[in-house]
């Protein structure tokens, strides 16, 4: 049987949604009102709204330079925009779907000559971002209930890495890795798969900090310090309509994180998972304790702000948006994998 870390998402998350339903009953809260925990964001940021709009809800000083490339923009104009952005901010740069999840469809552009080749892949609206070239990535979970802000969890994202043996190629070692999935083709194509790494040489494979894309997550909540909390609270508390979610951040090293010196690559909302629960050294019971505690916090934050005005679609429209967005994202991801 697979370790619970690798269970299908719907199976693993079922108890969370059942408990969240109980919390809604307890507070007499319509489930749709869970979005009101983050009433400043499109439906609380449940994965159907613009990541660019979410980013703009915060002070931009910690975020990468970002522009929006609309899907309907002609390819020739996209090429001009990308080159102008690269001239201003340098290469590499990142392109990622504006409505996306788990690292699907993300493209790293390190060479001007490859810009023309990626244009046919950009069928949905994309974010054009400066690449934050810092080696360590963390998820930092934030919650604010009854005026009390907290960092409820931290996880480090350990990027898939192979160790050379002087015999096998990068491609062979990657496909023998216990965390390997077909998604790895997203970044293996940017490496020389035929190269044979020297014995004990470490080769980092990925640039996407996603569990689905092969990252191992560890529970590093003990890294929280007053300095880190102050930096997180300064960013998040300034937006009263954001009370529950995870910041994905990059830092120079652990000491920098503890000092509150980080860059935010993405802010996530009510659909955020407390990813420190995925630590493979922990137990299933421990993971669910973390998960259900965050269900409680989400329901309490939403109940606190239940009277805030917020445009919420009918369930039918939400379901249609989710289905359409997932279909477009999966199609885009397959295009990127097949390029």
What are these regions (language model features)?
Residues 40, 50-185, 225-229:
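Active-site nucleotide/adenylate-binding loops and adjacent lid/helix of ATP-dependent enzymes
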